[in-house]
Amino acid sequence: MVAMPERYDVVVIGAGHAGCEAARACARIGLRTAMVTMNLDLIAQMSCNPAIGGIAKGHLVREIDALGGVMGEVADSVGIQFRLLNTSRGPAVWSPRAQMDKKLYRFRMREVLEAEPNLRIKQAEVAALTFDAVRRVNGVLLRDGRTIPAGAVIVTTGTFLNGLAHVGEMTYSCGRNGEAPSQLLGDQLRSMGLNWTRLKTGTPPRLDGRSIDWSSFEPQAGDAEPTPFSFLTGRIERQQIQCHIGYTTDETRRVLQEAIPRSPLYSGQIEGVGPRYCPSIEDKFVKFPDKVRHQIFLEPEGLDTHEVYVNGMSTSMPTDVQVAMVASIPGLEQAEMIRPGYAIEYDAIDPRELNHTLEVKSIPGLYLAGQINGTSGYEEAGIQGLIAGLNAAMSLGGSDPVIIGRTEGYAGILVDDLITKGADEPYRMFTSRAEFRLHLRIDNADARLTPLGRRAGLATDERWELFQRKERQKLRLTQAFETHKNGQLLKRPEVSISDFLPWIVEVLGEAPCRGLLETVSTEAKYGGYIQQQERQMARMKDSERRAIPHGFEYRGIPGLSREIQDKLDKVRPGTLGQAGRVPGVTPAAIAVLDCYLSLHIGPN
């Protein structure tokens, strides 16, 4: 007798940053979840830089944490240098960043995942998705012939779909350097009638720290008082390290310019579009010929390794050129290259094939998250994995979907940008993408999103109790400032809320929750601007409440040009607000559409 395959509620394909969040979310909510990866030892591998967070990216990590995700907690537990960025500017753009011990990050993430009773992690290659008679996903087929039936499948394959690496003139198929690509699944997905593209990313060489003259570089220390990512973290206790700053030279320029004909980026060998905001070092010298030098950062990859990541020197140049390029930098003349840099091309879907839940519009039960959707970055991948996991769980449980609006979080901005505008190049989050960034701060991510995580069943009792305590303290302290002379003093730019700490402890009767003082201070000093943004957000929410019916026909609407009809028909926006964000759709066209909806569909 042939044994029946074990059935799961959800199968997650891939165990990168998106896959880990998706799998853990589904399992934590109570779904039987299988996460399938081609290498169990590389769960949550940091394929590129050994860091979490950064400008806007730190906001995403806080939002992952506020919802009940895992990235922030793991990062806090293995971080080896923490810095709060942009502190010379306003609190809207403050953002935490931390260097990670890459090996410990993998180990800790695997430990967290294996502690989930509803989650099973399997080492295998998924060769294909399986479908029922009405083209709904109902599981996966493994390369060894086994099947795993499931109610939903979340694909988080990163750069593995038909991945092709480039080092100079040399090319080879891989998902990451030294790892096999996912060609069978990639070929099946490309045959399913969806729109795909090729994107490209790259990574720099790694050096042996013992061969570096560290005295030639400027040391960069972390903050004396580290800022954690997770609202659950008290203090960062782990040993902290230094990074170092250096610069390219005229010799670096000469080496690269002479080798440009050998660059796969400029020879036509690489066809995929690379990230605009993280260009390769050769691209920097070509596109910015007047810039005298470019900054690099030497970042240790861990506490028990000599391997050093050269941030700012991503390249796909031939290995001999990379050796000469490294040696052209003061302090690296004798540096030994452990691993060369390389570029990798991979398949990515046009994210306009998805809806706000990250489910493929035309294939029920199939969700996509991470680099497969055209994004770059661990943090962008992590939040997508969490959203896909939450929505797969909600769908299987018959609950309403989890939709985060543009006024509620950077998570909502990321998803809305992807499914409305597409991704012609790897998408990276910036604070400038937010209409209301003073409202979307790192200190209030819990106030914005923890109630949503609680309703979805993801936020734990511990997180919920801490959040409620902070909200009670905030109400009490805000009222106290409003009725005391200290309230007027606090509004002054030069006055710090920490000056009132003894009085605050007296008012609260206990020590304030972490982050509370930052929130109260910001809302006092920027109250007028925040109120103005709240009025603007209310208007945006009104436009989001004007729903456009599923399958709505744009053809034949008087006053809408054929071009705009085509754009709207391709994206299929769900609301009038989303329609207004479709590239090329004018305010006049939105007014016409609003009028037509009112006349023919009725008031919202």
From Swiss-Prot:
Q: Which UniProt keywords apply?
A: Cytoplasm, FAD, Flavoprotein, NAD, tRNA processing
Cofactor needs = FAD
Gene3D superfamilies, A to Z: FAD/NAD(P)-binding domain, GidA associated domain, C-terminal subdomain, tRNA uridine 5-carboxymethylaminomethyl modification enzyme MnmG/GidA
Which InterPro entries has this protein been placed in?
FAD/NAD-bd_sf, GIDA_C_N, MnmG, MnmG-rel, MnmG-rel_CS, MnmG_C, MnmG_C_subdom, MnmG_C_subdom_sf
Chain segments annotated as transmembrane: none
Xref: SUPFAM superfamilies: FAD/NAD(P)-binding domain
GO molecular-function term, one example from the UniProt record: flavin adenine dinucleotide binding
PROSITE patterns named in the record: GIDA_1
* GO terms of biological process kind: tRNA methylation; tRNA wobble uridine modification
User: Which parts of the sequence bind FAD?
Assistant: 14-19, 126, 182, 371
Cellular localisation: Cytoplasm
Q: Which residues bind NAD(+)?
A: 274-288
Give the record's GO CC terms.
Answer: cytosol
SMART domains per the UniProt record, alphabetical: GIDA_assoc_3
What functional role does this protein have?
NAD-binding protein involved in the addition of a carboxymethylaminomethyl (cmnm) group at the wobble position (U34) of certain tRNAs, forming tRNA-cmnm(5)s(2)U34.
Question: Family per UniProt?
Answer: Belongs to the MnmG family.
Record note on quaternary structure: Homodimer. Heterotetramer of two MnmE and two MnmG subunits.
Q: Which HAMAP family match?
A: MnmG_GidA
* Designated name of the protein: tRNA uridine 5-carboxymethylaminomethyl modification enzyme MnmG
> What species does this protein belong to?
Solibacter usitatus (strain Ellin6076)
Q: What is the lineage of its organism?
A: Bacteria, Pseudomonadati, Acidobacteriota, Terriglobia, Bryobacterales
